[in-house]
């Protein structure tokens, strides 16, 4: 017999009755009934009920066991009485009578219980992650992640992609986030960087003549934490192709992701048609570039109904350049209580409030109610109702000003309205491509022009477009949104040095700086670079959606906390003085 087990804790059935077996695992739960000790023994595969009566030669040792002791037992498989069969367990027809037991690893007092669904502070869960990972839900999440990655790899291979590994130590480059710098011992005063993405290397692969590339790539970014983003590192399905246009990339990645969501989506509907929505329309209709299309609400501009109206606040705002009034329709939201709650929500988000109109039954007709309705009058109110296609029991909310000042709040309000009114469809994965991103953006305070998205993207219109207004230039850049999350980001690359230098010049980077920062890629493009493009899909977010959790740390084995700390490994930590000396570094005191 094997030193530790003859079967897993999920393998024994009525067919094994009468056999002498060996199991190893953890004490999941222990119960004493009339002098008999019952133990649920757990391993990675499942649970088997074992019991020890006072006649057992190891009864005294079994009495000392506590939760999460790791043990090996030998025993005899016996059938449970019919009324004691547990149909919820694969092993529910049997139990094992202990004849021998060995403690493989004793357990101290537990900071968190593995058994049950009790909630614990996240700090506790992360500090004792090895205990947290023993819980069934966490094991399920991690196995799901492994299965998803394996499925992605197979689907990419089936599309004639091959996986290549790119360097983990490289040069720093401006790709939208802060770098993690690595000091060089052999070159004092100089630093490597952990790659924010394999961006330049995968493009260089295309220049090297490889037609298709993919990688399950680790990426490192020193970012502010969010529930859907790790503050230090993440994994992505990274891919690149030569001789492609934007639609070719869509046609490649769509069946891969659609297949993964159908395979692991637990029966949820997966949209078959993935619409293309311009960045401008996404901002207008949804207040975000990662809309949740399960929510049917579309915002609309209704400025004409307030211009010159009796509602002076909006009317005066509309006299200013670049302002508008935007409406958020709220089907079934027509109660003053709900409208007041949404107005309070806007105030909590930092806005003065949110105007509203709601429509109610009035005898044989319909009445528009709320302060706005009184101020703008029945004709304008009716025109708004018709434009928004609303009726009795419905409402509409209004925000005014420059879109940059209220758009994000409007998007969040749309989500809250959809959720609270039950409009957001459940058990569905709704995808949409967001396209036509602005190539550049201007700092609101300084007016400085910089890249808004990916600096290596091809501008729509090529070199000629860069001679005009930078803020009107669109890039061949695209994101894929699913249920309110950005899952994929990509672009058709700028493979022509002349256009690349011009694009960086618009963003304030001189030719010498471009050569210094991106010399490897710029030099490579002098030797016949093919048109190429690709994208990257976030593995962590894909699994997060499939696991039906809003916290990305639930699908990462050993995540950092929100302050970018690893409480289990005590990272970051202070270096030893001799390490700093060897690297030629000194830690300056912090104010």
UniProtKB/Swiss-Prot annotation:
SUPFAM superfamilies named among the record's database cross-references: Class II aaRS and biotin synthetases (SSF55681), GAD domain-like (SSF55261), Nucleic acid-binding proteins (SSF50249)
Binding-site list for L-aspartate: 175, 221, 453, 493
Keyword set includes Ligase: yes
Family: Belongs to the class-II aminoacyl-tRNA synthetase family. Type 1 subfamily.
EC annotation from Swiss-Prot or TrEMBL: 6.1.1.23
Subunit structure: Homodimer.
Residue numbers marked as site, Important for tRNA non-discrimination: 33
HAMAP family hit by this protein: Asp_tRNA_synth_type1
Pfam families the record matches: GAD (PF02938), tRNA-synt_2 (PF00152), tRNA_anti-codon (PF01336)
The species this protein was found in: Jannaschia sp. (strain CCS1)
Coiled-coil region: none
Enzyme class label: ligase
GO cellular component: cytoplasm
Protein purpose: Aspartyl-tRNA synthetase with relaxed tRNA specificity since it is able to aspartylate not only its cognate tRNA(Asp) but also tRNA(Asn). Reaction proceeds in two steps: L-aspartate is first activated by ATP to form Asp-AMP and then transferred to the acceptor end of tRNA(Asp/Asn).
One GO term (biological process): aspartyl-tRNA aminoacylation
Name this polypeptide is given: Aspartate--tRNA(Asp/Asn) ligase
GO molecular function: aspartate-tRNA ligase activity; aspartate-tRNA(Asn) ligase activity; ATP binding; nucleic acid binding
């Amino acid at each position: 017999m094997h030193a530790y087990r003859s079967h897993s804790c999920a393998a024994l059935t009525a067919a094994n009755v009468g056999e002498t077996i060996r199991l190893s695992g953890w004490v999941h739960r222990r119960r004493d009934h009339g002098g008999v000790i019952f133990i649920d023994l757990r391993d990675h595969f499942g649970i088997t009920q074992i019991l020890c009566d006072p006649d057992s030669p190891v009864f005294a040792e079994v009495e000392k066991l506590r939760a999460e002791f790791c043990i090996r037992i030998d025993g005899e498989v016996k059938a449970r009485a019919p009324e004691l069969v547990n149909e919820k367990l694969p092993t529910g027809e049997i139990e094992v009578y202990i004849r021998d037991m060995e403690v493989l690893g004793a357990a101290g007092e537990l900071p968190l219980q593995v058994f049950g669904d009790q909630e614990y502070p996240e700090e506790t869960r992360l500090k004792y992650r090895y205990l947290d990972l023993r819980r069934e839900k966490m094991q399920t999440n991690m196995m799901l992640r492994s299965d998803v990655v394996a499925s992605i790899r197979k689907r990419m291979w089936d599309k004639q992609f091959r996986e290549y590994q790119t360097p983990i130590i490289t040069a720093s480059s401006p790709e939208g986030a802060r770098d993690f710098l690595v000091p060089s011992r052999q070159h004092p005063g100089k630093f490597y960087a952990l790659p924010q993405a394999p961006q330049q290397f995968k493009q260089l692969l295309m220049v090297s003549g490889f037609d298709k590339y993919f990688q399950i790539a680790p990426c490192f970014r020193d970012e502010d934490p969010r529930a859907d983003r790790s503050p230090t590192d993440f994994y992505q399905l990274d891919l690149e192709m030569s001789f492609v246009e934007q639609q070719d990339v869509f046609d490649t990645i769509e069946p891969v992701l659609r297949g993964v969501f159908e395979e692991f989506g637990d029966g949820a509907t997966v949209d078959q048609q993935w619409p293309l929505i311009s960045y401008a329309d996404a901002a207008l209709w949804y207040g975000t570039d990662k809309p949740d299309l399960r929510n049917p609400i579309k915002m609309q501009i209704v400025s004409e109904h307030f211009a010159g109206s009796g509602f002076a606040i909006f009317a005066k705002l509309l006299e200013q350049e670049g302002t508008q009034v935007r409406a958020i329709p709220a089907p079934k939201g027509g109660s003053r209580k709900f409208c007041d709650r949404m107005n309070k929500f806007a105030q909590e988000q930092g806005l003065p409030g949110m105007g509203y109109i709601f429509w109610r039954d009035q005898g044989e007709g319909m009445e528009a109610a709320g302060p706005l309705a009184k101020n703008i009058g029945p004709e304008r109110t009716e025109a708004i109702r018709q434009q928004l296609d609303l009726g009795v029991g419905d409402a509409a909310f209004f925000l005014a000003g420059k879109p940059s000042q209220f758009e994000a709040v409007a998007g969040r309000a749309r989500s809250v309205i959809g959720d609270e009114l039950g409009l957001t469809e459940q058990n569905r994965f709704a995808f949409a491509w967001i396209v036509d991103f602005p190539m550049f953006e201007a700092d609101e305070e300084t007016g400085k022009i910089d890249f808004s998205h990916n600096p290596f993207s091809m501008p729509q219109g090529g070199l000629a477009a860069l001679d005009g207004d930078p803020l009107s230039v669109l890039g061949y850049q695209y994101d894929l949104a699913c249920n309110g999350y950005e899952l994929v980001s990509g672009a058709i690359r700028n493979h022509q040095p002349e256009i690349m230098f011009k694009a960086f010049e618009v963003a304030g980077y001189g030719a010498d700086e471009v050569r210094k920062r991106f010399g490897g890629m710029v030099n490579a493009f002098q030797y016949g670079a093919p048109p190429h493009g690709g994208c990257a899909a976030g593995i962590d977010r894909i699994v997060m959606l499939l696991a039906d959790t809003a916290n990305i740390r639930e699908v990462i084995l050993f995540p950092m906390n929100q302050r970018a700390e690893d409480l289990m490994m005590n990272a970051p930590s202070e270096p030893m003085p001799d390490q700093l000396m060897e690297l030629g570094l000194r830690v300056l005191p912090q104010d």
